[in-house]
Amino acid sequence: EWGFTPENQIGELRSAALPMSLNRQPHYTNGFVIVGDAGGMVSPFNGEGIAPAMKAGRYAAEAMAQALARTHRAGIDRAMSAYPQRIRDEYGGYYQLGRIFVRLIENPRIMRLCTTYGLPIPRLMTLVHKLLSDGFERQGGDFDDRLITTLSKMVPSA
C-alpha cells in the first residue's frame, strides 16, 4: 500500500521546470490537441496555469465543434487550426512581456529600483497588479487595460 512512512519521507530533493510561455508546441497537429501545462500555458508572470488551461480547453472544444461539422480531413484541419491561432492571439504577446519582465527583475539593481521607487506609488502598483495577475481586460477597459493590451501587441508573440 502506498503512503508516507518514515523510510520514504526523506529523499533527494528534485524539481522540474514549469512549462511556460507557450514553450510546448504544436498545440494542434494530426488530430492531437494539447492544452494547459502540456501546452506550456503557465504564466511567466506568476506561475499560474489553471485559468489559461480552462480557457484553452474552451477554445479547443469550440474548434472541435467546428471540426466535427466537416466531412474532409482538410476541412477538419482548417477548423482545428483556429485553436493554436487563438491561443497565440490570447497569450503570445502577454507571455512574451512576462519573459521580458522576468529578465528585468532578475537584475538586483533593477529590482531594488522597482521596490524603492515603484512600490510607494499606488497608481503604478494597480497597473503592476493587473499585469502580473493577468487581470486586465483585453478589449475595452481602463487606461491600464489598454496599455497592457497595447504592450502585448507590440512585442513578438511567444
Language model features with spans:
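FAD/FMN-dependent oxidoreductases across multiple families
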Residues: 1-64, 69
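C-terminal helical "tail/cap" subdomain of flavin- and related membrane-associated enzymes
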Residues: 65-158
